[in-house]
Protein backbone atom coordinates (compact mmCIF):
# COMPACT_ATOMS: atom_id res chain seq x y z
CA UNK A 1 0.00 0.00 0.00
CA UNK A 2 1.31 3.44 -0.94
CA UNK A 3 1.08 5.78 2.03
CA UNK A 4 -0.23 9.28 1.35
CA UNK A 5 2.21 11.77 2.86
CA UNK A 6 1.07 15.04 1.26
CA UNK A 7 -0.20 17.29 4.04
CA UNK A 8 0.40 20.58 2.24
CA UNK A 9 -3.29 21.54 2.54
CA UNK A 10 -3.40 20.87 6.29
CA UNK A 11 -2.75 23.87 8.51
CA UNK A 12 -3.58 25.45 11.82
CA UNK A 13 -5.78 28.54 11.93
CA UNK A 14 -2.82 30.63 13.15
CA UNK A 15 -5.08 32.51 15.58
CA UNK A 16 -2.35 33.23 18.11
CA UNK A 17 -3.30 30.35 20.39
CA UNK A 18 -1.10 27.39 21.26
CA UNK A 19 -1.11 24.98 18.31
CA UNK A 20 -2.11 21.56 19.63
CA UNK A 21 -2.03 18.39 17.52
CA UNK A 22 -4.22 15.60 18.95
CA UNK A 23 -3.60 12.13 17.51
CA UNK A 24 -6.07 9.23 17.79
CA UNK A 25 -6.50 5.93 16.00
CA UNK A 26 -8.90 3.65 17.86
CA UNK A 27 -12.33 3.55 19.48
CA UNK A 28 -11.06 3.86 23.10
CA UNK A 29 -9.04 6.98 22.29
CA UNK A 30 -11.98 8.65 20.55
CA UNK A 31 -14.34 7.86 23.43
CA UNK A 32 -12.05 8.88 26.27
CA UNK A 33 -10.86 12.04 24.54
CA UNK A 34 -14.28 13.24 23.35
CA UNK A 35 -14.84 15.78 26.13
CA UNK A 36 -11.15 16.73 26.16
CA UNK A 37 -11.10 17.43 22.41
CA UNK A 38 -14.12 19.70 22.61
CA UNK A 39 -12.66 21.55 25.60
CA UNK A 40 -9.27 21.93 23.91
CA UNK A 41 -10.91 23.50 20.87
CA UNK A 42 -12.17 26.27 23.18
CA UNK A 43 -8.69 27.17 24.37
CA UNK A 44 -6.21 26.09 21.69
CA UNK A 45 -5.70 26.12 17.95
CA UNK A 46 -6.38 22.38 17.47
CA UNK A 47 -5.82 19.86 14.72
CA UNK A 48 -7.21 16.33 15.15
CA UNK A 49 -5.38 13.59 13.26
CA UNK A 50 -6.60 9.99 12.90
CA UNK A 51 -4.01 7.33 12.05
CA UNK A 52 -6.60 4.92 10.62
CA UNK A 53 -5.61 2.12 13.02
CA UNK A 54 -9.31 1.25 13.44
CA UNK A 55 -10.43 1.36 9.83
CA UNK A 56 -13.92 -0.13 10.24
CA UNK A 57 -16.79 2.41 10.43
CA UNK A 58 -18.31 0.64 13.43
CA UNK A 59 -15.02 0.99 15.30
CA UNK A 60 -14.41 4.58 14.19
CA UNK A 61 -16.85 6.85 12.38
CA UNK A 62 -19.92 5.90 14.41
CA UNK A 63 -18.27 7.29 17.53
CA UNK A 64 -17.61 10.69 15.96
CA UNK A 65 -21.30 10.75 15.09
CA UNK A 66 -22.58 9.62 18.49
CA UNK A 67 -20.23 11.83 20.49
CA UNK A 68 -20.91 14.87 18.27
CA UNK A 69 -17.25 15.29 17.42
CA UNK A 70 -16.00 17.20 14.42
CA UNK A 71 -14.48 14.83 11.85
CA UNK A 72 -10.67 14.53 11.96
CA UNK A 73 -8.76 17.25 10.14
CA UNK A 74 -6.32 14.62 8.89
CA UNK A 75 -6.85 10.93 8.12
CA UNK A 76 -3.49 9.18 7.68
CA UNK A 77 -4.79 5.82 6.41
CA UNK A 78 -1.70 4.23 7.97
CA UNK A 79 -2.90 0.61 8.09
CA UNK A 80 -0.33 -1.57 6.32
CA UNK A 81 -0.21 -5.14 5.09
CA UNK A 82 1.03 -6.35 8.47
CA UNK A 83 1.74 -5.08 11.98
CA UNK A 84 5.27 -3.93 11.15
CA UNK A 85 4.08 -1.92 8.16
CA UNK A 86 1.27 -0.33 10.16
CA UNK A 87 3.55 0.72 13.01
CA UNK A 88 6.09 2.11 10.56
CA UNK A 89 3.39 3.96 8.64
CA UNK A 90 2.02 5.54 11.83
CA UNK A 91 5.43 6.87 12.83
CA UNK A 92 6.30 7.98 9.29
CA UNK A 93 2.98 9.66 8.52
CA UNK A 94 2.74 11.47 11.85
CA UNK A 95 6.35 12.66 11.53
CA UNK A 96 5.67 14.14 8.08
CA UNK A 97 2.50 15.77 9.39
CA UNK A 98 4.36 17.39 12.28
CA UNK A 99 7.07 18.69 9.97
CA UNK A 100 4.37 20.26 7.80
CA UNK A 101 2.09 21.85 10.43
CA UNK A 102 4.68 22.56 13.16
CA UNK A 103 2.54 22.08 16.29
CA UNK A 104 3.54 23.62 19.61
CA UNK A 105 2.52 20.41 21.42
CA UNK A 106 1.18 16.91 20.75
CA UNK A 107 -1.47 15.13 22.84
CA UNK A 108 -2.09 11.36 22.83
CA UNK A 109 -4.01 9.04 25.12
CA UNK A 110 -3.39 5.48 26.18
CA UNK A 111 -1.32 2.64 24.86
CA UNK A 112 -2.33 1.84 21.27
CA UNK A 113 0.05 1.65 18.33
CA UNK A 114 -1.22 5.09 17.30
CA UNK A 115 0.44 6.51 20.41
CA UNK A 116 3.81 5.59 18.92
CA UNK A 117 3.36 8.68 16.76
CA UNK A 118 5.01 10.57 19.61
CA UNK A 119 8.36 9.06 18.63
CA UNK A 120 8.46 11.53 15.74
CA UNK A 121 7.46 14.38 18.05
CA UNK A 122 10.37 13.55 20.35
CA UNK A 123 12.86 13.69 17.50
CA UNK A 124 11.39 17.03 16.40
CA UNK A 125 11.61 18.42 19.97
CA UNK A 126 7.85 18.96 20.17
CA UNK A 127 6.47 18.73 23.74
CA UNK A 128 4.42 15.57 24.30
CA UNK A 129 1.40 15.32 26.60
CA UNK A 130 0.33 11.76 27.46
CA UNK A 131 -3.06 11.09 29.05
CA UNK A 132 -3.66 7.77 30.87
CA UNK A 133 0.01 7.70 31.80
CA UNK A 134 1.45 5.29 34.35
CA UNK A 135 -1.04 2.45 33.85
CA UNK A 136 0.55 -0.98 34.14
CA UNK A 137 -0.59 -4.61 34.10
CA UNK A 138 2.99 -5.96 34.38
CA UNK A 139 2.46 -8.55 31.64
CA UNK A 140 5.09 -7.91 28.99
CA UNK A 141 3.40 -10.36 26.62
CA UNK A 142 0.77 -7.69 25.99
CA UNK A 143 1.73 -5.26 23.20
CA UNK A 144 0.00 -2.41 25.03
CA UNK A 145 2.36 -2.81 27.98
CA UNK A 146 5.34 -2.12 25.73
CA UNK A 147 3.62 0.91 24.22
CA UNK A 148 2.80 2.28 27.69
CA UNK A 149 6.42 2.12 28.78
CA UNK A 150 7.72 3.75 25.60
CA UNK A 151 5.24 6.63 25.60
CA UNK A 152 5.53 7.31 29.35
CA UNK A 153 9.31 7.57 29.19
CA UNK A 154 9.53 9.96 26.25
CA UNK A 155 6.54 12.19 27.14
CA UNK A 156 7.26 15.62 28.58
CA UNK A 157 4.04 15.76 30.61
CA UNK A 158 2.38 12.58 31.90
CA UNK A 159 -1.29 13.01 32.87
CA UNK A 160 -2.21 10.17 35.23
CA UNK A 161 -5.61 8.84 36.22
CA UNK A 162 -4.58 8.24 39.83
CA UNK A 163 -2.02 9.00 42.49
CA UNK A 164 -0.97 5.35 42.30
CA UNK A 165 -0.03 5.72 38.62
CA UNK A 166 1.87 8.93 39.34
CA UNK A 167 3.83 7.29 42.16
CA UNK A 168 4.69 4.37 39.91
CA UNK A 169 6.12 6.70 37.26
CA UNK A 170 8.11 8.64 39.85
CA UNK A 171 9.49 5.42 41.34
CA UNK A 172 10.54 4.26 37.86
CA UNK A 173 12.53 7.45 37.24
CA UNK A 174 10.06 9.89 35.68
CA UNK A 175 10.54 13.28 37.36
CA UNK A 176 7.76 14.57 39.62
CA UNK A 177 7.48 17.80 37.63
CA UNK A 178 6.55 15.70 34.57
CA UNK A 179 3.63 13.89 36.25
CA UNK A 180 0.17 15.21 37.15
CA UNK A 181 -2.97 13.47 38.40
CA UNK A 182 -5.98 14.50 36.31
CA UNK A 183 -8.32 11.54 36.76
CA UNK A 184 -10.10 9.72 33.94
CA UNK A 185 -12.23 11.78 31.52
CA UNK A 186 -14.73 8.92 31.11
CA UNK A 187 -17.18 10.22 33.72
CA UNK A 188 -17.58 13.51 31.84
CA UNK A 189 -18.10 11.71 28.53
CA UNK A 190 -20.75 9.39 29.96
CA UNK A 191 -22.47 12.14 31.93
CA UNK A 192 -22.75 14.33 28.84
CA UNK A 193 -24.28 11.44 26.88
CA UNK A 194 -26.42 9.84 29.60
CA UNK A 195 -29.74 11.10 28.21
CA UNK A 196 -29.00 9.66 24.75
CA UNK A 197 -27.76 6.40 26.30
CA UNK A 198 -30.89 5.93 28.40
CA UNK A 199 -33.21 6.76 25.49
CA UNK A 200 -31.65 4.23 23.09
CA UNK A 201 -34.15 1.74 21.65
CA UNK A 202 -31.50 -0.96 21.14
CA UNK A 203 -33.36 -3.49 23.33
CA UNK A 204 -36.44 -3.29 21.14
CA UNK A 205 -34.37 -3.54 17.97
CA UNK A 206 -32.52 -6.63 19.18
CA UNK A 207 -35.53 -8.15 21.00
CA UNK A 208 -33.68 -8.31 24.31
CA UNK A 209 -35.25 -8.06 27.75
CA UNK A 210 -33.47 -5.77 30.21
CA UNK A 211 -31.58 -7.71 32.86
CA UNK A 212 -32.04 -11.00 31.00
CA UNK A 213 -28.93 -11.12 28.79
CA UNK A 214 -25.14 -11.13 29.08
CA UNK A 215 -23.06 -8.64 27.10
CA UNK A 216 -19.77 -9.97 25.73
CA UNK A 217 -16.81 -8.19 24.17
CA UNK A 218 -13.61 -10.10 23.38
CA UNK A 219 -11.13 -8.84 20.83
CA UNK A 220 -7.65 -8.62 22.33
CA UNK A 221 -4.80 -10.00 20.24
CA UNK A 222 -3.66 -12.43 22.95
CA UNK A 223 -7.19 -13.84 23.30
CA UNK A 224 -8.10 -14.12 19.62
CA UNK A 225 -4.83 -14.88 17.83
CA UNK A 226 -3.40 -17.38 20.33
CA UNK A 227 -4.98 -20.80 19.70
CA UNK A 228 -4.96 -21.99 23.32
CA UNK A 229 -6.48 -18.78 24.67
CA UNK A 230 -9.02 -18.60 21.85
CA UNK A 231 -10.34 -22.11 22.49
CA UNK A 232 -10.34 -21.62 26.25
CA UNK A 233 -12.20 -18.30 26.00
CA UNK A 234 -15.00 -19.43 23.71
CA UNK A 235 -15.38 -22.79 25.44
CA UNK A 236 -16.00 -20.75 28.59
CA UNK A 237 -18.50 -18.57 26.71
CA UNK A 238 -20.42 -21.67 25.62
CA UNK A 239 -20.36 -23.01 29.17
CA UNK A 240 -21.65 -19.68 30.45
CA UNK A 241 -24.51 -19.72 27.93
CA UNK A 242 -25.50 -23.20 29.04
CA UNK A 243 -25.29 -22.43 32.76
CA UNK A 244 -27.26 -19.17 32.72
CA UNK A 245 -29.56 -20.10 29.83
CA UNK A 246 -29.92 -16.56 28.54
CA UNK A 247 -28.82 -14.74 25.38
CA UNK A 248 -25.19 -13.67 25.19
CA UNK A 249 -24.82 -10.71 22.85
CA UNK A 250 -21.30 -10.74 21.44
CA UNK A 251 -20.09 -7.42 20.06
CA UNK A 252 -17.80 -9.01 17.51
CA UNK A 253 -14.90 -7.06 16.01
CA UNK A 254 -13.92 -7.84 12.39
CA UNK A 255 -10.77 -9.74 13.40
CA UNK A 256 -12.68 -11.82 15.94
CA UNK A 257 -15.35 -12.68 13.37
CA UNK A 258 -12.73 -13.79 10.84
CA UNK A 259 -11.02 -15.92 13.49
CA UNK A 260 -14.26 -17.64 14.45
CA UNK A 261 -15.13 -18.30 10.81
CA UNK A 262 -11.69 -19.68 9.93
CA UNK A 263 -11.52 -21.90 13.02
CA UNK A 264 -14.94 -23.44 12.52
CA UNK A 265 -15.60 -23.10 16.25
CA UNK A 266 -19.28 -23.71 17.00
CA UNK A 267 -20.77 -21.14 19.35
CA UNK A 268 -23.75 -22.06 21.51
CA UNK A 269 -27.08 -21.16 19.88
CA UNK A 270 -27.66 -18.59 22.65
CA UNK A 271 -24.55 -16.62 21.65
CA UNK A 272 -25.58 -13.89 19.22
CA UNK A 273 -22.81 -12.38 17.12
CA UNK A 274 -23.41 -8.73 16.29
CA UNK A 275 -21.29 -6.10 14.58
CA UNK A 276 -19.77 -3.54 16.97
CA UNK A 277 -22.39 -1.10 18.20
CA UNK A 278 -22.37 2.67 18.55
CA UNK A 279 -21.59 4.47 21.79
CA UNK A 280 -25.17 5.13 22.92
CA UNK A 281 -26.50 1.69 21.98
CA UNK A 282 -23.64 -0.25 23.53
CA UNK A 283 -23.71 1.64 26.80
CA UNK A 284 -27.48 1.26 27.04
CA UNK A 285 -26.97 -2.49 26.68
CA UNK A 286 -24.16 -2.41 29.21
CA UNK A 287 -26.06 -0.54 31.91
CA UNK A 288 -29.04 -2.94 31.63
CA UNK A 289 -27.19 -6.25 31.25
CA UNK A 290 -27.32 -9.11 33.72
CA UNK A 291 -23.53 -9.16 33.41
CA UNK A 292 -20.79 -7.68 31.26
CA UNK A 293 -17.92 -9.93 30.19
CA UNK A 294 -15.06 -8.15 28.49
CA UNK A 295 -11.33 -7.98 27.85
CA UNK A 296 -11.56 -4.26 27.06
CA UNK A 297 -9.77 -1.59 29.03
CA UNK A 298 -12.54 0.95 28.43
CA UNK A 299 -15.57 -1.04 29.58
CA UNK A 300 -14.56 -1.34 33.26
CA UNK A 301 -14.48 2.45 33.47
CA UNK A 302 -17.90 2.68 31.83
CA UNK A 303 -19.43 -0.01 34.02
CA UNK A 304 -18.10 1.56 37.20
CA UNK A 305 -19.87 4.79 36.20
CA UNK A 306 -23.15 2.97 35.63
CA UNK A 307 -22.83 1.32 39.02
CA UNK A 308 -22.49 4.78 40.56
CA UNK A 309 -25.75 5.94 38.96
CA UNK A 310 -27.66 2.88 40.15
CA UNK A 311 -27.14 0.33 37.39
CA UNK A 312 -25.14 -2.74 38.39
CA UNK A 313 -22.98 -4.50 35.84
CA UNK A 314 -20.71 -7.40 36.70
CA UNK A 315 -17.36 -7.33 34.97
CA UNK A 316 -14.82 -9.98 34.13
CA UNK A 317 -11.62 -8.69 32.63
CA UNK A 318 -9.33 -11.03 30.71
CA UNK A 319 -6.45 -8.56 30.68
CA UNK A 320 -4.67 -8.42 34.04
CA UNK A 321 -5.92 -5.36 35.90
CA UNK A 322 -4.18 -2.18 34.85
CA UNK A 323 -2.79 -0.58 37.95
CA UNK A 324 -3.80 3.05 37.73
Spell out what each predicted region is.
Residues 53, 61-63, 198-288:
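Donor-nucleotide binding loops and adjacent catalytic segments primarily
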Residues 315-324:
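Single conserved hydrophobic/aromatic residue that forms the stacking wall/gate
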Residues 104, 271-272, 287-298:
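Acidic donor-binding loop of glycosyltransferase active sites
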Residues 2-53:
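N-terminal subdomain of nucleotide-sugar transferases
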Residues 2-9, 53-58, 77, 154-227:
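A nucleotide-sugar donor-handling region in carbohydrate enzymes
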